[in-house]
A protein has these predicted regions:
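Active-site entrance/lid segments in N-terminal catalytic domains of soluble metabolic enzymes
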Residues: 1-174
Length: 174
């Protein structure tokens, strides 16, 4: 089954598997598709570990990385606290997530009461650039931004490295 996607990436099937599991990335790519590592929330150090493992097992097959890098780089000065980042999440999103958990009988009464930890470093310009640089230090064929249009830094770096870019969107009006 040939397509433009197959020709573009040198894959046998126009199948892309977005996954957080490095094993799945490798197996999909080795089977003729393209595995794409969903690296949202990974620290640069963790992403390096995962990509190094993929490189050692993928037998030269193409793969991609899906990151979170806001186009606006909203937190340019890196000074937002976890509480401020939590406050940026729309109330509708919090309510939607809580409703899903409630339908599954997960207690949600204190879900947002704890102090947020370890989140949001990628939302700043420096954090996003760091994780993007880790991805480009590996032989990736595709880089995708999970938050829509990639920031200019990612686009420029992809052009420089000859890597295709992609954007995920949640609704057709995006």
């Amino acid at each position: 089954m040939k397509s433009k996607v197959c020709d573009m990436f040198g894959i046998e099937f126009p199948l892309m598997a977005f996954t957080h599991c490095r094993d799945v990335v490798v197996e999909v790519s080795k089977a003729g598709g393209m595995g794409v590592l969903g690296a949202a929330g990974f620290s640069p150090e963790q992403l390096e570990i995962e990509l190094k493992w993929i490189d050692e097992h993928i037998e030269g097959k193409p793969y991609g990385v899906d990151l979170i890098a806001p186009t606006t780089m909203a937190n340019k000065d890196e000074s937002a606290t976890p509480e401020e980042l939590h406050a940026m999440v729309p109330e509708e999103h919090k309510n939607f997530a809580a409703s899903i958990l409630a339908r599954r009988n997960v207690d949600t009464k204190d879900i947002y009461d704890g102090k947020p930890t370890g989140v949001g470093g990628f939302l700043g310009e420096k954090g996003a650039a760091n994780i993007i640089d880790v991805a480009f230090a590996h032989p990736i064929s595709l880089i995708v931004n999970a938050l829509g249009v990639p920031p200019q830094y990612m686009i420029d770096k992809a052009k420089e490295e000859g890597v295709a870019t992609g954007a995920l969107v949640g609704a057709k009006h995006h």
